[in-house]
């Protein structure tokens, strides 16, 4: 880790601050805004229930276990020693961070991306891309555009969502072959990058 301590944290008194400093800060940053060079996404727009589920999946080998998922294996190692209580505290800590819309990095057709999102993604992720609690589908608004692309490719390539205990990921694996055109994916990601995360 980079030697940064909990002193650099936004809310060092929070129950999840110590684990965030030890396990998350060096890749995801003080404000949870991530680093593209490390393929570490911004976390601040993610729902705490979703964060906790993903951390458990990494810890339990449901996600990040594919031998070709280099970045997922880093998350699996970082999550390995976390208890359910620590995961809940971490999710709460991340949820308390200010939401920041990540900078756009992909040049796509935003208007077409909106149309594609409404036709292909909104049934589960919502027309405003803020997710669907009943379906436990995560928000896509507020995610890094490059992360949306990389995760879609992982679903399509079987690096994510292939584990039988990942019932949500399995749905994405089934749906991912529907979009093979890179321009369409980039347009969707570019559109999502314009949507503010839920406050």
Predicted regions span which residues?
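Sequence/structural segment immediately N-terminal to covalent heme-attachment motifs in c-type
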Residues: 6-33, 106-130, 199
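Conserved hydrophobic/aromatic "anchor" residues
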Residues: 20, 58, 93-94, 117, ...
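Inter-heme linker and motif-flanking segments adjacent to c-type heme-binding CXXCH motifs
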Residues: 33-35, 64, 96-109, 122-123, ...
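C-terminal capping alpha-helices of c-type cytochrome domains
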Residues: 1, 77-102, 174-199
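Residue-level hotspots at or immediately adjacent to binding/recognition sites across diverse folds
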Residues: 30, 70-71, 127, 168-171, ...
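Gly/Gly-Pro-rich "capping" loops immediately C-terminal to redox-active cysteine motifs
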Residues: 17, 25, 32-63, 72, ...
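Intrinsic, low-complexity N-terminal interaction/targeting segments
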Residues: 22-26, 66, 89-92
């Amino acid at each position: 880790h980079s030697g940064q301590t909990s002193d650099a944290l936004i809310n060092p008194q929070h129950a999840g601050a110590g684990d965030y400093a030890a396990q998350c800060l060096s890749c995801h940053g003080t404000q949870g805004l991530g680093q593209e060079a490390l393929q570490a996404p911004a976390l601040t727009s993610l729902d705490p229930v979703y964060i906790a589920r993903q951390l458990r999946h990494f810890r339990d080998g449901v996600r990040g276990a594919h031998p070709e998922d280099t970045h997922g294996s880093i998350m699996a190692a970082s999550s390995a020693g976390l208890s359910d209580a620590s995961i809940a505290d971490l999710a709460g800590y991340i949820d308390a961070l200010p939401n920041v819309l990540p900078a756009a990095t992909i040049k796509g057709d935003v208007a077409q991306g909106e149309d594609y999102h409404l036709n292909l993604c909104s049934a589960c992720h919502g027309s405003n891309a803020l997710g669907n609690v009943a379906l436990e589908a995560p928000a896509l608004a507020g995610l890094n555009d490059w992360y949306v692309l990389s995760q879609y490719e992982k679903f399509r390539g079987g690096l994510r969502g292939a584990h039988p205990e990942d019932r949500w990921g399995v749905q994405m694996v089934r749906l991912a072959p529907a979009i093979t055109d890179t321009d369409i994916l980039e347009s969707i990601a570019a559109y999502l990058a314009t949507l503010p995360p839920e406050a």
